[in-house]
């Protein structure tokens, strides 16, 4: 039996890397003989769609811009509504908490 830590390390690392190599080879063999692998058929070529006309493209762009403007207006209105509801909730909370006369702590 040896007490040399370098020799023990080399033996351990040889065993570890040997096991890893064997597992890697086993994985390659399993992938090569995999019975559950689906058979890939020939892929059909993708047919390119014709380009839309300039008028249709312009109309689609206008519709997109209008939709974006509507969404932005809606979001702005929602933000205002949320801010108003939050302000009302804070005011209601303050109104309910004032009569309790809780001690104020200063840290």
UniProtKB/Swiss-Prot annotation:
UniProt-listed GO biological process terms: glutamate catabolic process via 2-hydroxyglutarate; sodium ion export across plasma membrane
One matching Pfam family: OAD_gamma
Signal peptide boundaries: none
Catalytic reactions on record: (2E)-glutaconyl-CoA + Na(+)(in) + H(+) = (2E)-butenoyl-CoA + Na(+)(out) + CO2
Molecular functions (GO terms): glutaconyl-CoA decarboxylase activity; sodium ion transmembrane transporter activity
Cell membrane as UniProt keyword: yes
Pathway assigned to this chain's UniProt record: Amino-acid degradation; L-glutamate degradation via hydroxyglutarate pathway; crotonoyl-CoA from L-glutamate: step 5/5
Transmembrane segments: 10-32
Region (Disordered): 37-60
Subcellular location: Cell membrane
Function field: Part of the primary sodium pump glutaconyl-CoA decarboxylase (GCD). Possible membrane anchor for the alpha subunit.
Stated name of the protein: Glutaconyl-CoA decarboxylase subunit delta
Gene designation: gcdD
């Amino acid at each position: 039996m040896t007490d040399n830590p370098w020799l023990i390390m080399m033996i351990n690392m040889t065993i570890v890397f040997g096991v890893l190599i064997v597992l890697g080879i086993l994985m390659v063999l399993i992938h090569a003989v995999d019975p559950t692998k689906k058979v890939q058929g020939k892929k059909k070529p993708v047919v390119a769609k014709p380009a839309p006309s300039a008028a249709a493209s312009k109309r689609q762009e206008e519709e997109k811009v209008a939709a974006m403007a509507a969404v932005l207006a809606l979001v702005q209105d929602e933000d205002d509504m949320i801010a108003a509801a939050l302000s009302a909730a804070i005011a209601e909370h303050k109104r309910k908490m004032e009569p309790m006369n809780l001690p104020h702590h200063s840290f």
